[in-house]
């Protein structure tokens, strides 16, 4: 299977697997696009890894980001130095892992870590990306949300539109607001435990395809137990 790169795009030091597509006016450097992965118009990627069937819509800006299979983003997505799991649904105008400014120092200005202003000689005074930023699997992030550095969003969580996430989010928890606060759990604790145990997002694609009706059911303990059975058989 061949890949496609629009003639207007620049792709350097990058591996494209079969079926991957890079659309108009993109700039991709030192990255890897998995089988069937898509990158929309006017996107810029550097040191990124996209899993199988990952879909990045137009005007994305991504640096040192790893995205799992089947995860997709909306327009104007930005990410820095972060890891995003499988089967995530990320809406438009979402920002993940933006740099921190250390407000405990005399100044928060970027000349402490950027040579662009001509005031820094030598190495940056601190690493603005030192705190990890991790998004789990099957996470839904609504439009205009911001996930700050140092935050881990657990599997199955939901981040409401416009939320600013400054603290860790537990698995299968819905958060909203500025700053984001827990609203409720998506399911009862036993169903959540079973879904996490199942690791269904690691199942082979064909197994998921063959069981779409199961995955479309309302989540409860019985449905989760059936997912567990699939995982025990195929993982």
Which residues does each predicted region cover?
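Glycine-centered loop/turn positions within well-structured domains
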Residues: 104, 163, 167, 171-173, ...
